[in-house]
């Protein structure tokens, strides 16, 4: 039984269904309507700001994404808009030290002005820039919708509309999960509740919501932006249908998902400073999402100190990127196998 039907929970359920007779997902609201729905969908495994222990997992997950996306499309009959054109990073200064070494390992290379103009003709930026060729993006709303359909196709059961609040113990091991109205008996319980993971007893994991405000626009010119474009104060993520996502803030605002018009305007202007035509684009939507953060910005992955109780939460800004590898290693852990990657840095025992 898995509590939480965001991209992590749904991906794990789908993976477990290959090996388990039955898998139940229990979701507080509608599947995939929280952080997964609000994400930009960048597959930013080359990001020099990625915490060091995550780099190996992130690189592996990025390599899994094409096959992962194709399987989901095949099983669901839906498209997820996986784009692999790469990322253009606009730096106030070129990366140095460990950051430079890491992004170089990810096919990072500096861009001369003429090549930058060729790759993004409408980008008006004269500072240092780099091209992270293996990166890309996916439409997270399409991905989670297709993933839910694919999970159902594999036989995963989904109960929505009620939050898991307690894990029932018997003899020191997890035997069931409870919502306000229902008890679900289970041989194994996995907490995939994201920012809400700490609200599920008996272990109060130190997850917290980190608010991010974003907007989506459409420009008159189709193909205005060809790549994900990242700068210190803003990022721009194009979709294949002409929509362009602009984000984002990092706010400690609890579970408040209200949108501030001034903040949205500031993000829109920051994007227009890079690509002036974005300033004339038509706004389609604004929203705020709650990223699941932890004190050290690393996810919680693996078994807990309670037998048969597992956690996969706290992926912060990288849930979409890390979904494939999380599904793999957590499926292995839940089934009692040794995970392909060392999860000790992500153990909940560190808190």
Residue ranges, per PLM feature:
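Glycine-rich FAD pyrophosphate-binding loop
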Residues: 17-39
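Active-site substrate-recognition segment that forms the wall
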Residues: 11-19, 41-44, 78-83, 183-308
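N-terminal Rossmann-like FAD-binding beta1-loop-alpha1 element of flavoenzymes
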Residues: 1-25
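Flavin (FAD/FMN) cofactor-binding core of flavoprotein oxidoreductases
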Residues: 109, 114-117, 137, 209-210, ...
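Short beta-strand to alpha-helix junction loop
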Residues: 56-59, 93-95, 130-149, 258-263, ...
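Helical element adjacent to the flavin cofactor pocket in flavoenzyme catalytic cores
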Residues: 130-188, 192
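Dinucleotide-binding Rossmann-like beta1-alpha1 core, especially the glycine-rich loop
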Residues: 41-119, 270-272
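Short hydrophobic core segments
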Residues: 1-3, 26, 177, 184-196, ...
